[in-house]
Design a protein with these regions (language model features):
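Active-site-proximal cap/lid insertion segments
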Residues: 2-5, 11-25, 132-157, 167-229
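Short alpha-helical segments and helix-capping/turn motifs at coil-helix boundaries
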Residues: 111-113, 163-172
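Extracellular/periplasmic catalytic domains that process cell-envelope and extracellular macromolecules
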Residues: 1-3, 32, 85-86, 119-122, ...
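Active-site segment of extracytoplasmic enzymes that catalyze sulfate/phosphate-ester chemistry
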Residues: 5, 9-10, 16-94, 102-104
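Aromatic-residue hotspot detector
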Residues: 38, 123-124, 180-181
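Phosphate/oxyanion-binding active-site loops and adjacent basic polyanion-contact surfaces
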Residues: 158-162
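Catalytic-site neighborhoods of secreted/periplasmic enzymes
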Residues: 57-156, 192-206
Length: 229
């Protein structure tokens, strides 16, 4: 029997296709060269939670019911990790989830900044995540949770720390005799919701301060020069 391939799904948040290039994202370009590259693909939902729901279920947002942010993934729908578990894979999720909390206050589950209940973790065996990562962290420093709800603090640039949690799984957290499916979900380059701007890596401010915007955004003045990082 042929050895089954390991799978790493590296997911960024609110990122345009034309921001992936050798200058800005050389490591993502390297992953694309060494991994599987889909050159003609599209998200079926422009909104954060619904787009994630589509990825985790394989169906449209109107089918799974997550058609807007703040609608938890229905427990009646079989999630992606279930099929990998059935196929003998070890499954892991690291980063932002955004599929467990209800939008309306006082109704349903609210775990935006608290542990995601086990039954709402999409059947991933290994869990290092927060439902709304921008509520538990800023560009630098914060916390996530393990699968049992234990708080895990981190210090440093958030994207780097999420990568470190993923590396920790690869080095010591996985079942070594199984192939693995690892879903890494970054918040970056999404803006920081509680003060409405993107917190970039401090060391890159001078490097990218005059980086040209995509042509269709040049007429929008915005405040990115003032608010980065």
């Amino acid at each position: 029997m042929a050895k089954r391939k390991n799978i790493i799904f590296y997911f960024s948040d609110q990122q345009r296709w034309d921001t992936v290039n050798e200058t800005v994202t050389p490591n993502l370009m390297q992953l694309a060269k060494e991994g599987t590259l889909f050159e003609n693909n599209f998200t079926c939902q422009p909104v954060c939670g619904p787009a994630r729901a589509c990825l985790q279920t394989g169906v449209y947002a109107t089918q799974c019911g997550c058609y807007w942010n703040g609608i938890p993934l229905p427990e009646s729908i079989t999630p992606l990790a279930h099929y990998f578990n059935e196929a003998g894979y070890d499954t892991a999720y690291v980063g932002k989830w955004h599929l467990a909390s209800d939008r309306l206050p006082g109704i349903g589950t609210h775990c935006e900044a608290t542990p995601v209940p086990k039954e709402k973790q999409g059947e991933y065996r290994y869990w290092r995540a927060a439902d709304v990562l921008e509520f538990t962290s800023h560009g630098y420093d914060g916390y996530i949770f393990d699968g049992d709800g234990n708080k895990l603090d981190f210090t440093g640039y958030r994207a780097d720390c999420i990568n470190d949690f993923a590396l920790e799984y690869l080095e010591s957290g996985r079942e070594a005799d199984k192939p693995f499916f690892l879903f890494i979900s970054q918040l970056e380059p999404h803006h920081q919701n509680d003060h409405h701007h993107y917190e970039g890596y401090k060391e890159t401010v001078n490097q990218y301060k005059d980086y040209p915007l995509p042509p269709d955004l040049t007429f929008l003045k915005g405040d990115y020069k003032e608010m980065y990082p």
